[in-house]
Curated annotation (Swiss-Prot):
One of its GO terms (biological process) is error-free translesion synthesis. Disulfide bonds: none annotated. Signal peptide: none annotated. Residues 2-126 form the ApaG domain. This is Protein ApaG. Transmembrane segments: none annotated. The gene is apaG. It holds the Pfam family DUF525. SUPFAM superfamilies: ApaG-like (SSF110069).
């Protein structure tokens, strides 16, 4: 029996951090809060992350590593895990997407897609 991947829901909200940004230096700081919901009937553990980060100029970087914010959380059935992290762009707009490598309580490894989301300084249209 394979794990029902569609039972993992991922939602992301981003915020521009004006006080930490420096527009003259081309430093645009953002936070983002990720909520991962486990709608299955077994535990899942987030093992690693892979982010693809693209600024408004098309410059792309990738971030890979174990867990998130120093944790490899186990999410119980019908529960959620939430964390906040951040990134810095050289442009006032950027996009992020990626995937989490997860492991079910049955030992099955699978990938959960992180949908693309926009990070933008308020008032910027791009």
């Amino acid at each position: 029996m394979s794990f029902p991947i569609d039972s993992i829901k991922i939602k992301v909200e981003s915020h521009f951090l004006a006080q930490q940004s420096s527009l003259l230096e081309g430093k645009y700081v953002f936070s983002y809060t990720v909520t991962i919901v486990n709608l299955s009937d077994i535990n899942v553990t987030l093992k690693s992350r892979h982010w693809i980060i693209t600024d408004a100029n098309g410059a792309e970087s990738q971030v890979k590593g174990p867990g998130v914010v120093g944790e490899t959380p186990t999410i119980a059935p019908n529960n959620a895990y939430q964390y906040t992290s951040g990134t810095v762009f050289e442009t006032p707009v950027g996009f992020m997407h990626g995937r989490y490598t997860m492991e079910s309580g049955l030992g099955e490894t699978f990938e959960a897609s992180i949908p693309s989301f926009r990070l933008a300084m308020p008032g910027v249209m791009q």
